Swiss-Prot record:
Basic and acidic residues: bias regions: 62-83
Recorded name of the encoding gene: xseB
Family annotation (InterPro entries): Exonuc_VII_S, Exonuc_VII_ssu_sf
Role of this protein: Bidirectionally degrades single-stranded DNA into large acid-insoluble oligonucleotides, which are then degraded further into small acid-soluble oligonucleotides.
A GO molecular-function descriptor: exodeoxyribonuclease VII activity
Family, similarity comment: Belongs to the XseB family.
GO biological process, one term: DNA catabolic process
GO CC, alphabetical: cytosol; exodeoxyribonuclease VII complex
Ranges where the record places region Disordered: 62-95
Protein name: Exodeoxyribonuclease 7 small subunit
């Protein structure tokens, strides 16, 4: 099963990598086959790492975006600056 980076899913790459690792551990390959399997395993590792890095970047971006939204809005979705202005106006009315 030789698939290129753009065509293989994370799950498929990981499954193939696990199969290669198991065969290498059992020494089911000749030396030449072992080298080819190791090379394929390294390709699959890079594919998996790239997919994980992309997912991590997306999560970080979403988290940053969400934290900005959380910091800009109050409990009821009102901006904190509006709430502060209203509170200040109410305090001034008391004095």
């Amino acid at each position: 099963m030789v698939e290129t980076k753009s065509k293989i899913s994370f799950e498929d790459a990981l499954m193939e990598l696990e199969q290669i690792a198991e065969k290498l551990e059992r020494q089911d390959f000749s030396l030449e086959e072992s080298l080819k399997a190791y090379e394929r395993g390294m390709e699959l590792k890079k594919i998996c790492q790239g997919i994980l890095d992309t997912a991590e970047g997306k999560i970080e971006a979403l988290t940053k975006d969400e934290s900005k939204k959380t910091n800009k809005t109050g409990f009821r979705g009102e901006s904190k600056t509006t709430e502060t202005k209203n509170n200040t106006a109410q305090e001034e009315d008391l004095f």
